[in-house]
């Protein structure tokens, strides 16, 4: 038996209670979660405690776990690919910021609705005359996109077929190309773009169109190999995600963590390569 599971009640007690209570009695008392370590304000490595992750995703998941009576720890597991491997193997239970993909479904149980939305906006220089009201307006213009971006499958097909996009290793280089005039726009998340603009000192030089061109969700995803993966946990998480989506709390938490990230920039902490 996994050491994180509660010992449970005596067999006689389990037979006397309803099925819901019997199921809850065997729940995990502790979950280990991870995610991208370089994606502020969603998640990033805690500069004061590098073994842990902080950010909007961590705050929301910690709150949800407390409501369920479960202890949760957000641990740094390495870069994105390493974090995914840790969860797929079951060594860690939960991925906090999983994009919905067909390959992901082979190893993960996604909890709906998503923990956070990640609106992708069109970023341009402040002096740009480019007018974008819909994705089709980008046709014929040169743009850039970080290879680490995780768009929806539908928009990915559209971008591949219809847009002239340069893929860069990270968002830093995409924004630098924009300021140098090598591209006309960059596709980047609303909050990740703001965080990177602050990091690079470009906040006064860039602007973002208000209308998202893509809205990929960032999901909680439980490993198929986690000893804690059971119907009770998935059901409770789904209920809490539904309540969270209706509450409007996520945007306030994102704003707070954007300010938190900006405050950390005042200290000599390395900028993330998104």
Residue map of PLM features:
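Short loop->beta-strand "edge-of-pocket" segments that line small-molecule binding or catalytic clefts
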Residues: 29-37, 42-43, 135-150, 242
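Ligand-binding clefts/hinges and TM-proximal coupling segments of bilobed small-molecule sensing domains
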Residues: 71, 150-163, 204-205, 239-274
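A ligand-binding cleft/hinge motif common to bilobed small-molecule-binding domains
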Residues: 81, 98-106, 156-157, 184-215
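Ligand-binding cleft/hinge of the Venus flytrap
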Residues: 44-47, 61-69, 113, 137-139, ...
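Periplasmic-binding protein-like
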Residues: 36-38, 117-121, 200-238, 260-271
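Extended ligand-binding regions for polar small-molecule ligands
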Residues: 55-67, 141, 149, 221-260
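Flexible hinge/capping segments at coil-to-helix
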Residues: 124-143, 231
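Extracytoplasmic small-molecule ligand-binding "clamshell" domains
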Residues: 25-99, 103-107
């Amino acid at each position: 038996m996994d050491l994180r599971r509660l010992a449970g009640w005596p067999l006689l007690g389990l037979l006397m209670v309803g099925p819901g209570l019997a199921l809850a009695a065997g729940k995990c008392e502790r979950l280990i979660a991870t995610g991208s370590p370089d994606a502020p304000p969603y998640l990033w490595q805690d500069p004061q405690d590098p073994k842990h992750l902080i950010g909007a995703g961590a705050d929301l998941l910690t709150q949800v776990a407390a409501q369920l009576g479960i202890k949760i720890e957000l641990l740094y597991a390495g870069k994105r690919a390493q974090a995914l491997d840790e969860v797929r193997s079951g060594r860690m239970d939960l991925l906090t910021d999983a994009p919905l993909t067909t390959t992901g479904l082979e190893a993960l149980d996604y909890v709906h609705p998503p923990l956070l939305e990640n609106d992708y906006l069109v970023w341009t220089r402040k002096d740009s005359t480019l007018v974008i009201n819909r994705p089709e307006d980008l046709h014929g213009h040169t743009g850039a996109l970080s290879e680490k971006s995780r768009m929806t499958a539908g928009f990915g097909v559209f971008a591949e077929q219809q847009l002239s996009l340069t893929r860069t290793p990270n968002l830093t280089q995409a924004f630098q190309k924009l300021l140098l005039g090598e591209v006309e726009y960059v596709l980047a998340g609303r909050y990740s773009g703001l965080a990177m603009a602050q990091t690079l000192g470009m906040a006064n030089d860039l602007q973002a169109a208000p209308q998202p061109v893509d809205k990929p969700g960032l999901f909680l995803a439980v490993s198929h190999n986690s000893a804690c993966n059971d119907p009770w946990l998935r059901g409770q998480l789904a209920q809490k995600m539904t309540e969270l989506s209706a509450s409007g709390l996520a945007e306030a938490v994102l704003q707070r963590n954007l300010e938190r990230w900006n405050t950390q920039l005042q200290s000599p902490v390395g900028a993330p390569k998104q």
